Amino acid sequence: MKKIITISALLLTAFAPQAMAQEQTQPTQQTARPAFDNELLPWETPRDTTCHEVLLETTMGNIRVALYNDTPHHRDNFLKLVNSGYYNGCIFQRVIKNFMIQGGDYSCRKVTPGKVEKFDVNYTVPAEIIYPKYYHKRGQLCAAREGDDENPTKASASTDFYITWGRNFSPRQMEYYVEKEKREGAKSYALPSEQLQQGYIKHGGVPHLDNGY
């Protein structure tokens, strides 16, 4: 079963469209894919589970995201925030070319004059880093967090999320990246396997975040 939830968000502007509280349930469509692509789309779950998808409606176009069932803390937290209306009127407050877009910060929400909204945001979400099954290829929905010094357990922020974009890698650029990470040694979170290297060459992404975020 596939459940689709629609919310309104903002992109690079402080004016939100009217919030929508709309939820649809549709049968899951099973589509045959090449073996390698199956591993690049790990949110495709067995028929007897529910695949939760959220449609972000922004002033720059719509973004559809899928939530992984094997990261249940993050899935449930995101759905809770969506269903509460928290993200309606939020902006993407951090946009970095060839890296990612980040939204959800409490201080960047549009507040309707005269309307009182109370949201509990003073908590963190336990880390659910499942690497190398999930990695930072282009288009991944991820939870933001504080840095390692302040946050050694890598717990995620309650509301902030980002969607990866990253850069395109040629085979030679990917080879150079791996060589550089080997030289970094302990400073590197992870070295991408040959399979993940091919994924980054094919799709692009942000490999230096792997196994750390």
Give residue ranges: language-model regions.
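Cyclophilin-like peptidyl-prolyl cis-trans isomerases
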Residues: 19-213
